[in-house]
């Protein structure tokens, strides 16, 4: 079978070295970088003129909760910090039906894709009885859209009755969680280069799972060589919970259950002291910075630069769309740059550094060395942005303008060599119909929660 080659020609700007005149794509891979004033050495059948486009590696979202798109700007959860925010929404989320979860996943992924995101990791930890096959549903939606995903089998096993935060209606027992985790790995995890679906294991947080489950999950992940993920040190409430229940701060607790390794990435990671930062860095633990969520819930600011300095990888995530309340990845890069500048100053947090967190940084968090960069041999995942909106008029540095002028939508997005977005529209998707179905599901969920 002949594989078509395409020259993405003469980009306005590109986040790659020695590629001023573009890149050549063959099948699902990048096969050549075309330097300034040069033409491809490789043969090519198609040419795409990118002279009005900024070309980025596909953005990678390393932490999300797709189902939360159903409870954006939810009245009972407004103007609250993490623990009261969660308690107000657990009782709503407990009523999510399979069809609601499916449309929430489709909308979250579509919103991400339109913002230039080509790979997304979802942390789904909510399994009320009617939603036992939540990850299977997500796999189907991911395959339908053609994006890449790391779907994490989350869990909650420590309910209010046993001193945890979530209500009993959304917790499972440890054995059920471990059996399901192994089933999902066996059924869906693709460890090979270029894979479209991977599975990771992700107990929700120290305040919602048992110590035994944390230990058993680490052993299971090691057995199947999959990655580990959880929320950690998002708020001081969490630190206080761990001190009161376990007599340990969060990092020491994580160490005690066998989680400090380079196969672990953590969401948020805000409230670490200097010794803990060094300990995490020595172990190679990754941190997913979620700036919009951290600002919305007033959680704090992640110590990105100290963490990087001591060996941690930093990536980016939009977090749940009820604590953001969006799923826009290019906007999240802008938020990260601005929030980190407040902490470290403008010169230390450049637009290039923020973009690297959202591309190569997030790829490393997910354990992927085949995506996240425009490099020969890596997957052809690209996001192209045009600077023809009013917001960009008068801008001079195209890469900087993406963030400083507030890009919102990609013009084209390629995943594995296939255009999934053309002219800021997802190929084959009726956006209006999706919004209608999603809005109806959100309204139904709200009504269900009010009846209990």
Where are these regions (language model features)?
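Glycine-enriched alpha-helix->loop->beta-strand junction motifs that scaffold or abut catalytic
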Residues: 220-227, 259-262, 279-288, 309-314, ...
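Alpha-helical scaffold segments that flank or form the walls of functional sites
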Residues: 73-123, 128-147, 179-193, 439-450
